[in-house]
Amino acid sequence: SLKNPLLAGGEGTNHSPSDSDFDADTFSSSTSASFTSNFAIGSIDTGSDSKSYSGYDYTLALTTSYNGDDSLEVELEAGNTSNLAELDLHQDGDGLRVGSISYTKPLGERLVIFFGDGAAGNKLYSTACVYSGVTNALDDCGNLNAAIDKEFGTAAGLSADLGNGFSAAIGLETQNTGTGIFTNESADAFGAQISYTGDNYGASVTWANIENTGAQAAGVLDTDEGATQSTAFNAYFAPDLNNFPSVSVGFESNHDDSSDLTDANDES
């Protein structure tokens, strides 16, 4: 065959070899792709370094549905913005690599489940935030830790439509290296969220328990045993008025229960 069905963008899966010019058992014709590239230049004043840096990131996101309701998502990414760490951009180098892969599937009319590797544990959350920006804290409307996105490795989650605009979700991440998943040696994170979405406003409460990891090695447990509990409150208002801005607000508090820390280490 001379045709490449990868980005055919058709509806549903291919069930008959006569329907298109590729084998019925090889690939779905419902795969789509999106491409994103960002360029940045700036500086971060750390008190000891305020030099200016530039960088970029690139994302290729592939989405496939096999029955019209499920979704297999693969994200390829590259970026060199490590000197601008406060930006919500890729920082792992110039080589294009698989950043995450996940599969999402509905269970009946009200439940949705997902699992994957490299994906965020908050994938099924409905955080009440309509602001979109480039920095980590502002882009998340202050929900920086409670909405789990630690890149530990294995991730899974479940969401439930409670009706009348209310929804609930749980998410988890766990280290997937030589220590095994959900063991005493692995770094684990789990959390939950309850949210409400109205016609032009919404609110959500998010909570998470994240085991502390070493500053230089994501997913490696800190030598000081403990975990950080985070709670975030978010809300937004998006009036249906021409030229009137939307408003998003958020507040998060964090408590580190490490044995050698005190309440003075609480942050918000």
Language model: regions and residue ranges:
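Beta-barrel outer-membrane channel/assembly domains of diderm bacteria
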Residues: 1-118, 139-177, 186-190, 195-199, ...
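Surface-exposed extracellular loop regions of Gram-negative outer-membrane beta-barrel proteins
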Residues: 82-84, 118-133
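A short secondary-structure junction signal
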Residues: 125-128, 171, 179-184
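Outer-membrane beta-barrel and related beta-rich outer-membrane complex signature
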Residues: 125-129, 217, 261
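Flexible, surface-exposed loop regions and adjacent strand-edge segments
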Residues: 130-135, 264-266
